[in-house]
Regions:
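Transmembrane alpha-helical segments in integral membrane proteins
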Residues: 27-28, 99-109, 182-202
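Hydrophobic alpha-helical transmembrane segments of integral membrane proteins
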Residues: 51-61, 133-145, 209-242
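Juxtamembrane helix-loop-helix connectors linking adjacent transmembrane helices
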Residues: 72-94, 105-183, 201-215, 287-289
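Hydrophobic alpha-helical transmembrane segments
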Residues: 57, 89-90, 128-133, 173-177, ...
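Hydrophobic core segments of transmembrane alpha-helices in multi-pass, intramembrane catalytic enzymes
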Residues: 95-99, 178, 245-253
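Membrane-interface helix/loop boundary segments of multi-pass membrane proteins
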Residues: 125, 186-227, 255-262
Length: 289
C-alpha cells in the first residue's frame, strides 16, 4: 500500500467515524425528546394549501415538460460534433430554473402565496440549524445503506458517470450547481410542498381536522409524507437501488416540512446531502487516478 492510499484510508475512516458518531448522537437526542413527550421538530402552525389535485398535475407537467423541452431545444441548435453531455447538463440547469419560476408563477396566479408555497425565510436561522441536525442524522446510515445496496444493484447515474470520466473544473462546477442548488430547490418545491402539502390538506379534510397544520397526533400526517416520499424515490428509479435510501431520505425531509410548512431547511439538507455525495465521488476519482 502506498503512502497516498494509507492517507486516504485513514481519512475515510476518520470521516466515517465522525459521521457515525454524529448520527448516533442525533438518534439519542431524538429518543430523549420522545421520552419527554417533546416534538422531534418544533411545530410551527401553518395554513392548509389552497391548490387542487389538478394543480399538482399541472406542476409536474411544467417541471417534466420544460426540462425535456429544454434539452431537446438545445440539441436542435448544436451540431453532432459537440459532446452532448455538457450541453444537456447546461440545458437541464437552465430549463429547471425556468420550470421553477413558471411553477411558482402558476400557483401565485391560482391564489397561493409565497408563504403557502413554503418560500419563507422568516425563521431561516432556526431552519438552518434543523438542516445541520438533519444532515448529522442521515448522512451515515443512508450512505451506508446505499453502499450495501450498490453491491447488489450497482448504482448508475449518467451525470455521475460523466463526472468520473471528466476531470474538468467547468463540468464539476456545473454538476455542483445542479446537484447542490438547482435540483434541491425544484424537487423540494414539487414533492415536499406542492404534492405533500396537497396530500396533507386532503388528509386533514378527510379526518375532520379543522385547525391549522400540522395535525397534532404523531399518527396523523405520515400517510401524506410516505406517499410523497415514495414518489420522490421512484422519480430516481433506474439509478440502481438508489430509490430506496432516497425514499427514506424523503421521509426525513417530508417530516421537517410537515412540521413547519417551510422549505428552507429541506432545501439546505437536500443540497448538503447531495454535496457530500459529490465530494465522495470526487475523492474516489482522485484515488482511482
Amino acid at each position: 500500500m502506498s503512502a497516498t492510499e494509507g492517507t486516504f484510508d485513514f481519512g475515510t475512516l476518520l470521516v466515517g467515524t465522525v459521521a457515525v458518531s454524529l448520527s448516533v448522537s442525533m438518534v439519542l437526542l431524538i429518543l430523549k425528546r420522545l421520552l419527554r413527550g417533546q416534538n422531534v421538530v418544533a411545530a410551527d402552525s401553518h395554513s392548509p394549501v389552497s391548490w387542487t389535485g389538478t394543480d399538482v398535475c399541472v406542476a409536474f407537467m411544467i417541471m417534466i415538460g420544460m426540462q425535456l423541452g429544454g434539452v431537446i431545444l438545445i440539441r436542435s441548435f448544436v451540431g453532432p460534433s459537440i459532446e452532448t453531455r455538457p450541453v444537456d447538463l447546461a440545458a437541464s440547469i437552465c430549463s429547471t430554473v425556468c420550470a421553477v419560476v413558471c411553477t411558482i408563477g402558476f400557483f401565485l396566479k391560482r391564489g397561493a402565496t409565497l408563504s403557502m408555497l413554503g418560500l419563507s425565510l422568516l425563521h431561516w436561522r432556526q431552519d438552518a440549524w434543523r438542516a445541520i441536525a438533519g444532515l448529522a442524522l442521515v448522512v451515515a446510515p443512508l450512505l451506508t445503506l446505499a453502499g450495501v445496496l450498490d453491491s447488489f444493484v450497482p448504482y448508475h447515474h449518467p451525470i455521475i458517470d460523466f463526472l468520473k470520466a471528466h476531470q474538468d473544473a467547468t463540468v464539476t462546477a456545473m454538476i455542483v450547481l445542479s446537484a447542490v442548488v438547482v435540483v434541491p430547490i425544484a424537487e423540494e418545491l414539487l414533492f415536499r410542498r406542492i404534492l405533500q402539502g396537497w396530500l396533507e390538506t386532503r388528509e386533514a379534510q378527510r379526518s375532520g381536522w379543522e385547525g391549522p397544520l400540522p395535525m397534532t397526533s404523531y399518527s396523523k400526517g405520515w400517510g401524506s409524507i410516505a406517499v410523497a416520499s415514495l414518489c420522490f424515490g421512484l422519480a430516481h428509479y433506474g439509478q440502481g437501488a438508489a430509490w430506496i435510501p432516497l425514499t427514506l431520505f424523503g421521509m426525513v425531509l417530508g417530516w421537517s416540512v410537515s412540521q413547519t410548512g417551510r422549505l428552507f431547511s429541506a432545501i439546505l439538507l437536500h443540497g448538503a446531502f447531495n454535496c457530500v455525495s459529490v465530494v465522495i465521488c470526487l475523492l474516489q476519482n482522485n484515488q482511482a487516478s
